[in-house]
């Protein structure tokens, strides 16, 4: 009996240890203490409650003092698709300007006729046609005879200056005009700058005849310019400046030295 008692005690201890092993361990106490300054904020509680209640693809905006999405719906939402025109750039409609009223000569004449019919006073037209213009242009054969301005045969207008110019002055003038009038009284008018010369018949103002430079009958190729030696056409002739002939290069060189000394 005494031997069976300790065996029974041992078996009871084994059974109790097996029962303790089958039961789950008790939960450990939560030792994490969150900071009350951050997680106790009402904004954080609202944010966590929203995150738990609403999925991420729903339309909600974060509450923050500087959020620009508080009053606007979420642009990342896929439940409300945007129309195609939402992504297209808006192009303003072009302004259409009315074409101005364009009037031609015929419209002006019609308006003038209508105004003249309705009003008693005549309307002065600003448009003149070529058929209504009465301008008589004398022909070239009658020029100077049918015009209103007439002068005696040898009388000139007081504004015309008559003077005799030298040949050198005429050559230097750049403005030169010659007018020939045909008809019963043909005249030739020469205009040199500010001077006017009229050549008419029977009396006329004599024009200065340019004096022709009398060239010597002897050509410059017939005699040497330096030594005055007659030049033979069969021999070489040296020319200087196109107007002086020489029999040799020495005579031409002497003339070239003289020209350099003079200049």
UniProtKB/Swiss-Prot annotation:
GO terms for biological process: response to abscisic acid; response to glucose; response to mannose; response to sucrose; seed dormancy process. InterPro entries: FLZ8/MARD1, Zf-FLZ_dom. GO terms for molecular function: kinase binding; zinc ion binding. It comes from Arabidopsis thaliana. One of its GO terms (cellular component) is cytoplasmic stress granule. Keywords: Cytoplasm, Metal-binding, Zinc, Zinc-finger. Pfam families: zf-FLZ. It comes from the Eukaryota. Belongs to the FLZ family. May act as an adapter to facilitate the interaction of SnRK1 complex with effector proteins, conferring tissue- and stimulus-type specific differences in the SnRK1 regulation pathway. Involved in seed dormancy control. The keyword Transcription does not apply. It is found in: Cytoplasm, Stress granule; Cytoplasm, P-body. This is Protein MARD1. PROSITE patterns: ZF_FLZ (PS51795). Disruption phenotype: No visible phenotype, but reduced dormancy and fast germination of the seeds. Strong resistance of the seeds to abscisic acid. Interacts with KIN10 and KIN11 via its FLZ-type zinc finger domain. Interacts with KINB1 and KINB2 via its N-terminal part. Interacts with TZF4, TZF5 and TZF6. Interacts with MPK3 and MPK6. Induction: Up-regulated by abscisic acid. Down-regulated by the transcription factor ERF114. Down-regulated by glucose, sucrose and mannose. Induced by abscissic acid (ABA).
């Amino acid at each position: 009996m005494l031997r069976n008692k300790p065996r029974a005690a041992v078996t009871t201890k084994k059974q109790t240890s097996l029962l303790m092993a089958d039961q789950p361990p008790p939960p450990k106490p939560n030792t994490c203490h969150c900071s009350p300054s951050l997680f106790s904020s009402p904004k954080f509680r609202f944010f966590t409650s929203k995150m738990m209640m609403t999925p991420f693809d729903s339309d909600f905006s974060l509450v923050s003092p500087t959020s620009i999405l508080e009053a606007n719906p979420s642009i990342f939402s896929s439940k409300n698709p945007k129309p195609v025109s939402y992504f297209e750039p808006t192009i303003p409609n072009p302004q259409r300007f009315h074409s101005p009223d364009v009037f031609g000569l015929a419209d002006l004449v019609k308006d003038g006729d209508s105004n003249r019919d309705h009003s008693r006073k005549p309307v002065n037209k600003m448009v003149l046609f070529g058929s209504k213009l009465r301008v008589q242009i004398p022909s070239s054969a009658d020029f100077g005879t049918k015009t209103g301005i007439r002068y005696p045969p040898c009388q000139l207008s007081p504004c015309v200056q008559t003077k005799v110019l030298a040949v050198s002055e005429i050559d230097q003038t750049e403005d030169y005009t010659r007018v020939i009038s045909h008809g019963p009284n043909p005249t030739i008018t020469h205009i040199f700058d500010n001077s006017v010369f009229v050549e008419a018949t029977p009396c006329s103002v004599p024009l200065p005849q340019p004096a022709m430079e009398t060239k010597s009958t002897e050509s410059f190729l017939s005699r040497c310019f330096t030594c005055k030696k007659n030049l033979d056409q069969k021999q070489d002739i040296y020319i200087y400046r196109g107007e002086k002939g020489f029999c040799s290069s020495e005579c031409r060189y002497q003339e070239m030295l003289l020209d350099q000394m003079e200049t």
